[in-house]
Swiss-Prot record:
Primary subcellular site in the record, as a coarse category: nucleus
Subcellular locations according to the entry: Nucleus
Keyword vocabulary terms for this entry: DNA-binding, Metal-binding, Nucleus, Receptor, Transcription, Transcription regulation, Zinc, Zinc-finger
Protein name as annotated: Nuclear hormone receptor family member nhr-125
Family matches, as PANTHER family: NR LBD DOMAIN-CONTAINING PROTEIN-RELATED, NUCLEAR HORMONE RECEPTOR FAMILY
Organism placement in taxonomy: Eukaryota, Metazoa, Ecdysozoa, Nematoda, Chromadorea
Amino acid sequence: MDLVSTSTSPFSCRICNQKAHGNHFGVLTCRACASFFRRAAFSKWSQLKCQKGGCSRNFCKRCRLKKCREMGMDTTKFQYNRDSFRATGQFQLPPPRSLASFVGRPELFLFCDTEAPNAKMLIDVRYLLEEAGRIINQGYETPASGKNQLENLTEGFKYIKVDMNNISSSKYASKDAIISMWEYYFFTVTRWLMYFEGFQKLNSHTQITLIQSVWNVWSRLHKYVATVDYHKANPDTLPTNVVIHNTLVDIENVEFDSTWLSDYPVEHVRRYLSVQHCREFDILGTLRKLNPSELEITYLFAQICFEHAGKRNQGDIMKVTEQFLDSLANDLHDYYVNEMNNSRYFLRLTQLLKINQAIQFSDISPQKQIRNNIIKKEAEKLEKLQKSQFSIKRLSISN
């Protein structure tokens, strides 16, 4: 609507003859008369008689309202819901951002039958703990000779480094192959930790608890390191090729037997797992760019394992792992300053640790999500996907 300035308007209000403000509800009026009509248009004054018996200049409310209507003020020109706030009772939740968030299920399984029977299949893994205990009792395979704990642990790098001459390829991931992979990583982590003096001094219960806590996260970092090494040695290989254990797998084309893991269709399970793989390219790119030494890689493995175990178990184990991390950090500082002659290593170390951060955070933006919620949501997705469970819950692959 066209407004007329009160300081320069030569026009008068059609209701009270005061200086006009503008066109309100179809009539040139002042602010006061416009506000009055807005308040009184649907009030009792429309039905009452004149309070003075006849108004000529100083209108009563009934006559003022009558004059407004006679001059042409129109209630159909009222505008509603223009306030910058809303009453509490009118608040409405925004619509969900996606169907998956509304339903509470991963996108890949929206149209699967949620009522279908999903009996759990028990996987007996007690023999893993028995074999790990035997390895611990055997002690070193070869005595460590490093000058500090990080160097001793680096002597176990032979368990991290993959023999490129003995890598086989596979186009089918069977149940036996997957369980064999779990065994390999569980026992390899145990042998590797035996090179760490602090681990040897722990009681057997704490040792087993640490192994149970870290074997899975250790295997994830191992997959990245082995894959980067393979791509360096074979630059023409497909970017979707990854090395798991000592096997080359095209993650996009591998046939996957998931019938023992889940009742969901195989293609849905594989698609879910391939989505997880798509998130890993940044980690692989960072490893290629930084090209860390054996000692730096060893520190990455130790850092992610002990930090993960501490946060997961809390209490006394967290105190122990914090001591381990402090000791290893001092050894790494000595390596950078005295051997690499690099006292300004902070930026490089920060970039290296971002690899571990990405693994733990599943590369979902930490600026937008709380870490605990991320882990909980991803674990819930995997829990819905699985129909198998370990005889020892702490060994679950979702941990």
